[in-house]
From Swiss-Prot:
InterPro entries: Ribosomal_uL16, Ribosomal_uL16_bact-type, Ribosomal_uL16_CS, Ribosomal_uL16_dom, Ribosomal_uL16_sf. Binds 23S rRNA and is also seen to make contacts with the A and possibly P site tRNAs. This is Large ribosomal subunit protein uL16. GO terms for cellular component: cytosolic large ribosomal subunit. Keywords: Ribonucleoprotein, Ribosomal protein, RNA-binding, rRNA-binding, tRNA-binding. Part of the 50S ribosomal subunit. NCBIfam families: rplP_bact. Coiled coil: none annotated. GO terms for biological process: translation.
Length: 137
């Protein structure tokens, strides 16, 4: 599972996921990519599940680039615990996703196979996505 090796602070505020993704919104490493069209959160488990789905579909064909990393800790209080008495313990890590963010890229496989793999991976994600290709200028 992906998570930071060390962080400056153990717990963070909830915050708001607003705006569009300007950084990480172009295909940089591969030839075809999957891009988020809605905002949401992607847990480390979801990142890994989608990665495994893509890699199983393309087998040994190409290279997968993961463009997201879960760097935000999410806390939960134990069951049947009264409110108050501080913030809960860190349970899992998420990555805040804004519309336009590139999630995964593939290089070295034909486009049909890559689209198939991304379609399977999109079913594992909690928001709508689209498939984009690199534009050469």
């Amino acid at each position: 599972m992906l998570q930071p090796k060390r962080t400056k602070f153990r717990k963070v505020h909830k915050g708001r996921n607003t705006g569009l993704a300007h950084r990480g919104s172009t295909v940089s490493f591969g030839s075809i990519a999957i891009k988020a069209t809605e905002r949401g959160r992607m847990t480390a488990r979801q990142i890994e599940a989608a990665r495994r789905t893509i890699s199983r579909r393309i087998k040994r064909g190409g290279k997968i680039f993961i463009r997201v990393f879960p760097d935000k800790p999410i806390t939960e209080k134990p069951l049947e615990v009264r409110m108050g008495n501080g913030k809960g313990n860190v349970e899992y890590w998420v990555c805040e996703i804004k519309p336009g963010k590139i999630l995964y890229e593939i290089e070295g496989v034909n486009e049909d196979l890559a689209r198939e793999a991304f379609a399977l991976a999109a079913a594992k994600l909690p928001f709508k996505t689209t498939i984009v290709t690199r534009t050469v200028m």
